[in-house]
């Protein structure tokens, strides 16, 4: 009987360990692109990057109140704010902007996986990493020819 309990305990432990190893564990404080964290204020972004080249209002039921403000800095670097806080950053060019783990457009997919682990979801050419299992926020890396072609950080649509 004692043997049975040990065997059951070992099996349970192995199942828990293997289940935890499957998910990428991206902590929320890793949601940083170009030195700007998820939730940063408009004033902080302005202090780092200055005034945006263009400002647009976006309408989407996904956003609180149905709208967001997008700041475009040029060179395919855009920041979306909802209620004055960063909710998404998008980079789609080799412009030197990178994540806190040094992943930028042009980075090899193996370097991406070494930095963040296996993605939580692969949807077509997108490698998706959730923050602590929350499928509403994280990173989406678009992969083309085994390289990062686009980075989205924040709200996942």
PLM regions and their residue ranges:
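Bacterial N-terminal signal peptides that target proteins for export
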Residues: 1-10
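Bacterial N-terminal signal peptides
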Residues: 10-19
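A cross-family detector of function-defining hotspots
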Residues: 26, 42-82, 104-156
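Second-shell loop/turn segments in exported
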Residues: 29-36, 96-103
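A low-complexity, Ser/Thr/Gly/Pro-enriched, surface-exposed linker/loop concept
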Residues: 85-88, 92-96, 105
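Short, solvent-exposed aromatic-acidic interface loops
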Residues: 91-95, 152-157
